[in-house]
Amino acid sequence: MAPKILAVINQKGGVGKSTISVNLAYGLYLKKKRVLLIDLDPQAHSSCIYCPEIPQTETISLAFTDKKLNLKSIIMKAVVGNEMIDTLNIIPSNIKLATVVEQISGTLYREKILKNHLDKIADAYDYIVLDCPPTLGILAINAIYCSNSIIVPTSFGRYSLDGMADLLGAVKEIKEGQSYNFFVLKNLYEKRNSQTNKYVNEQLESLKDNTFATTIRKNEAINQAQITNLPVQVFNSASKGAQDFDLLTEEVIHNA
């Protein structure tokens, strides 16, 4: 059975894509799913959480520059604390990924590169989570093309929804002829910011059928978990952050 491939994407920075990718992947693992997290962001924030030492060469960059690559050769077991996890894997990134765009600029069907690799390991995973870069370039296009669910995190800032219409239009064009799910995920919610919250919710009214019921609250445990290179569910399983990601994981399993 083919895995569900989830692209976590927004061309705006600071909306929590990597935080969501890391904790959603761990949430799916806790639900007994076989999970692969692929870091497509040269900033490598997801890689920092699950890889004590990020490789210099065995990264996702190779998937774009070596057509004959066996993808399994760059898949690593995620490390949480001191434990290597068999059913939570990661393909890490590093800053060198930023140069890949130039290297493949003349490659035919370059939007299909990632899909061609993932098709060969389809039976190994239940879920593949793609942590996308904050630009709508060829890396993000590859992620959109091969995914069956698009998750767009948005924060509760005044300008947090800028570019949403452009992103939706790009996704529709890239996925032409393919079926896919699309979800907005409200992140970094603070109850005290009532006017901003009201504004964001009003702006999302037209997308209410495509918005997750779960909202990820701004929570210090999530920040502290990142500092200690842990998913929030491990750092503090009783925290609001862990509770929110458990609810999100359930929604993803049932709807995405």
Task: Go through the PLM ranges and name each one.
Residues 1-256:
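P-loop NTP-binding core
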